[in-house]
């Protein structure tokens, strides 16, 4: 059984931003699973009234929400990461998630084959934005750099 590295992505996360962290912890023979929320490009609504245009827009929306289209978009989203990690012997997969990302990560962790979870630290992003705004006013001060990524041991979740 291959050791898995889970990378749950939120709506606005870029896989390329997490690539250096995954490269650092992954070893050849491991498998990285990028968990992308469904729908990949966010929600869309129809703005047309009842008419022929509304029917045409409904068809476009139906094709926009198809699972295959979103899976293709998710694969295109992480294509640069796949290329970089495949060169190092790390297998990469896409898991398109329609439900709770937290529950999906917990389900993977319960199975026992997850080695590590790489995710963005929400509080880290907030602190980094705060320090960026303060540092713009006080450029002469040296500010500490916080890592905005957390590495989580899955045994702490179960």
Annotate each predicted stretch with a short phrase:
Residues 11-14, 98-102, 123-124:
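Short beta->alpha connector loops
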Residues 83-116, 156-158:
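Structural beta-alpha unit
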Residues 33-35, 93-97, 150-152:
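General small-molecule cofactor/ligand-binding pocket signal
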Residues 2-61:
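Small/aliphatic-rich secondary-structure junction motif
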Residues 21, 72-81, 104:
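Short, solvent-exposed amphipathic alpha-helices that sit
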Residues 56-74:
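A short acidic, glycine-rich active-site loop
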Residues 28-31, 88-91, 141-150:
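Structural alpha-beta junctions
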Residues 107-158:
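Gly/Ser-rich helix-loop-strand patches that form or flank binding pockets
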């Amino acid at each position: 059984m291959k050791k898995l590295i889970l990378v749950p992505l939120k709506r606005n996360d870029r896989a390329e931003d997490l690539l250096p962290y995954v490269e650092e912890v992954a070893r050849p023979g491991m498998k990285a699973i990028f968990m992308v929320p469904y729908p990949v490009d966010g929600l869309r609504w129809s703005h047309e009234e009842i008419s022929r245009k509304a029917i045409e827009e409904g068809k476009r929306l139906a094709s926009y929400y198809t699972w295959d289209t979103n899976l293709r978009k998710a694969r295109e989203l992480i294509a640069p990461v796949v290329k970089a990690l495949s060169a190092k012997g790390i297998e990469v997969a896409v898991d398109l998630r329609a439900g709770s990302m937290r529950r999906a990560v917990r389900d993977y962790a319960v199975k026992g084959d997850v080695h590590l979870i790489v995710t963005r630290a929400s509080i880290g992003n907030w602190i980094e934005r705060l320090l960026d705004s303060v540092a713009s006013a006080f450029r002469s001060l040296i500010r500490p750099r916080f890592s905005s990524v957390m590495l989580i041991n899955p045994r702490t979740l179960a």
